[in-house]
């Protein structure tokens, strides 16, 4: 797979995760509602930024980003969430799994971009990996 193709898959994942985490944000229940509501807001805002950054990089490489939800659904590798009631522990377990998926995808992006001589995408992918690995560590500590 080429760099721009991986970027498109990641862009699809980012928009699906944006919606998925909104679902968690709106539908969490329990005594820790306020903390989880705030935490999930920060997370979905991060996915909005990621979606935009990926789209812009795709354009910079001379390709067209995803512009419809139907395109995103076809390309995503993330499982949508259709339930509408959640407890915080379940939310954070699901987000942790999604972060691990993204970590794998950004490693693939970094390696592929490196082979193609695309240093800018390598830097972007590695920056995302650093953020994801910190988030994974924090969620694992929270769930321990």
From Swiss-Prot:
GO terms for biological process: intracellular iron ion homeostasis. Its main location: cytoplasm. It is an enzyme of class 1 (oxidoreductase). GO terms for molecular function: ferric iron binding; oxidoreductase activity, acting on metal ions. Gene3D superfamilies: 1.20.1260.10. It is found in: Cytoplasm. Fe cation 1 binds at residues 25, 52, 56. Signal peptide: none annotated. One of its GO terms (cellular component) is cytoplasm. Belongs to the Dps family. Homododecamer. The 12 subunits form a hollow sphere into which the mineral iron core of up to 500 Fe(3+) can be deposited. Protects DNA from oxidative damage by sequestering intracellular Fe(2+) ion and storing it in the form of Fe(3+) oxyhydroxide mineral. One hydrogen peroxide oxidizes two Fe(2+) ions, which prevents hydroxyl radical production by the Fenton reaction. Required for the survival in the presence of oxidative stress. Dps is also a virulence factor that activates neutrophils, mast cells and monocytes. It binds to neutrophil-glycosphingolipids and to sulfated carbohydrates on mucin. It might have a role in the accumulation of neutrophils and monocytes at the site of infection. This is DNA protection during starvation protein.
């Amino acid at each position: 797979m080429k760099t721009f193709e991986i970027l498109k898959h990641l862009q699809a994942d980012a928009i699906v995760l944006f919606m998925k985490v909104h679902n968690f944000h709106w539908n969490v229940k329990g005594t820790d509602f306020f903390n989880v509501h705030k935490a999930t807001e920060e997370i979905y805002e991060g996915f909005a930024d990621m979606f935009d950054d990926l789209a812009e990089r795709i354009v910079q490489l001379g390709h067209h980003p995803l512009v419809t939800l139907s395109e995103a659904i076809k390309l995503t590798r993330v499982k949508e969430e259709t339930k509408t009631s959640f407890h915080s522990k379940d939310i954070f377990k699901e987000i942790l799994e999604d972060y691990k998926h993204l970590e794998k995808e950004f490693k693939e992006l970094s390696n592929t971009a490196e082979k193609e001589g695309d240093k800018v995408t390598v830097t972007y992918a590695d920056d995302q990996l650093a953020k994801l690995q910190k988030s994974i560590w924090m969620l694992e500590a929270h769930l321990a």
